[in-house]
Regions:
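Residue-level signal for pocket-adjacent positions within structured domains
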Residues: 13, 35-36, 40-43, 81, ...
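Arg/Lys-rich, positively charged N-terminal/basic patches that mediate binding to nucleic acids
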Residues: 1-30
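A short, surface-exposed loop/turn module that caps and links secondary-structure elements
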Residues: 32-57
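Enriched for short, Lys/Arg-rich terminal
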Residues: 2, 16, 59-62, 67-91
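Generic beta-structure capping elements
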Residues: 8-10, 51, 78-83
Length: 91
């Protein structure tokens, strides 16, 4: 069964500011079919320590911050920032 995917305005705004090559890689993950079928994407999604439902996906020097609700089968893309900033602003 496919998971529901949501995107925050902040995520979309931050994604539009990324370098072109990084943005293309983020778009492949965020808008691709793989995340709908398996949000844990065979090891690419890593749990944030100290948080039950928050995860990160590493893309070079950038990180995507996501919230996964297993009960509702919902994946919410919340932030995409450089690795030095993501842990200050997410979750």
């Amino acid at each position: 069964m496919a998971w529901k995917i949501q995107y925050t305005r902040t995520f979309l705004k931050e994604m539009s500011r990324l370098p072109v090559t990084t943005r293309e890689r983020v778009e492949q993950i965020a808008f691709g079919e793989a995340i709908k079928n398996d949000p844990f994407m065979s090891g690419k999604t890593q749990k944030l320590s100290g948080h039950q439902t928050y995860y990160k996906i590493r893309i070079g020097d950038y990180r995507i911050g996501i919230h996964i609700d297993g009960d509702q089968e919902l994946v919410e893309f919340q932030r995409v920032l450089h690795r030095r900033e993501i842990y200050r602003k997410f979750p």
